[in-house]
């Protein structure tokens, strides 16, 4: 078995990893052809019927550089990674087509969902609802934001912990 196959995550492992991490790096192609990389908060949602999942969603300001980039080329590469030492490195890279959604009825609930996820410290019980001032802030921001639906086309995964400290 190749090293590549040895470190590859299963579908369940990759889904659990994505659910447990909190920041995705989103790479789009900038106006001068250089990659434009930015961190994003995200949530995972079930995919539409008949599709494999989960599907990653985020939001950003509608006038952001990444949205301008996606208007020219709707492709993005996403990476979620963890670990510091080589034998601890693990991650998921997704090549995606991005659907930029402008409808407030899509954007506002997504913003609430994102803030609900991040209102809870890592490892703590989820909050039952957002504090009212946070919910109001999200509602105000929603009119300036867009939803980003990342439709996965290809994936690569790695988990160097599977090598048992060797390479």
Can you describe what each PLM-predicted range is?
Residues 18, 69-70, 114, 150:
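A generic structural signal for nonpolar/aromatic side chains embedded in well-ordered alpha-helices
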Residues 61-64, 74-80, 126-135:
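Short acidic (Asp/Glu) patches
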Residues 60-65, 115-118:
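Short, solvent-exposed aromatic-acidic interface loops
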Residues 20-21, 72-73, 144:
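Structured helix-beta-strand junction loops
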Residues 21-62, 70, 78-82, 90:
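Short beta-strand segments
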Residues 2-25:
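Short, basic/aromatic recognition patches
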